[in-house]
């Protein structure tokens, strides 16, 4: 039986994931190469302390990668658990990436669940945290893998200046550009050590109906700087802020 045939049977739930795949720790270069090729963010902000690969039993082909890093942000661990950033007992799931041949299968949950089992065996990590972009999804994969849900991140705004910088230092009073709401993220955590207490309140898990819509431009693709009476392309939706000279508005 070919790998393609096995994946087809697996996608129809006629055989189990453990009959098709196995999981093992992989090197950072292996993870980087795979993630760069298949993840929508490419190699942007790629942080990795440990990585695990999903391999086909027959042929040993790498089909998925999970990467774990130290939580990003100077106060991340303090906010979650009251820990300092010098404490290395908590990981953040930084990437979860699959080959397109596994689209519409539950191989992703098999990889994530198996990766956490491996971390448990190693006995060094007390929890795994992750954030799900609220305008993209609600973190269904984390719910399937028994992560606990701890609500949304706080509401914040970002300043996009006309010269392409985001949140430049200093006063923005005389700087051309726009303030836009930052996408809020769903907080999830898998607590390995039950003695580790999360400071955020556990909440009911969100459903797909609670996916938030970006309020940056309300789908128009343009944003307005009312201080200088200027219109720009929406940097959230278009990837960059560009002045629109002749919008006719």
Question: Residue spans of the language-model regions?
Answer:
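Acyl-donor binding region in acyl/amide transferases
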Residues: 22-25, 67-180
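Short linker/helix segments within small regulatory modules
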Residues: 224-232
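Conserved beta-hairpin
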Residues: 35, 49-73
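Residues immediately within or flanking Cys/His clusters that coordinate Zn2+
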Residues: 211-214, 231
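A conserved mid-domain beta-alpha-beta active-site/ligand-binding segment of alpha/beta enzyme cores
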Residues: 182-194
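Cys/His-coordinated zinc-binding microdomains
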Residues: 218-221, 238
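Short amphipathic alpha-helix that is part of the acyltransferase structural core
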Residues: 5-47
